[in-house]
Amino acid sequence: MSGGGTNCENIIRYFSGSDRVHVALVIANKPGIPALEKADRLGVPTRVLPKADLNREDVLLPLMREYSIDFIVLAGFLLVIPDFLIREYDHRMINLHPALLPKFGGMGMYGHHVHEAVKASGEAETGMTVHWVSGKVDGGEIIAQFRTPISPAWASPSSWRPRSRAIRTRLRGATATLSVLGRSR
């Protein structure tokens, strides 16, 4: 986690009653962010790892084993994922991306930056994409997309937030369940 934790909180709540999926750990690269507070409040263990440790196989993989992590959901995590983790969790790690891929992905395409790019492009719709994590930023196979028309009333990308959050709420449960329970390679 890198930020506000809306995705994190909704995923934890979605799976809170599940007998098949357990959110075992929330990892962040910044201390004191709302995502950590939300996870703590919901009873999910948290860890803060600086960027240097997130890139160390000898730190990250033992932590994953300690918490018996079988599947990873990147929900607002803004760092590039190291190759060793991608190999270890091949087709067991998904990313929630705040725009329609492949058009609006890659380095720098997050948060308000991606929404500004969509607005500047003149696109008629926006949305959210869930994809498998690969060695290319936002380049993994697409699992699901949810689309919504861009209203002329949305004067700026910041006015898209409520609509974007509504899409994310619909998308999270469906695709997380699909990915965790129904898809294997």
Model feature map: region roles:
Residues 1-185:
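One-carbon transfer enzymes
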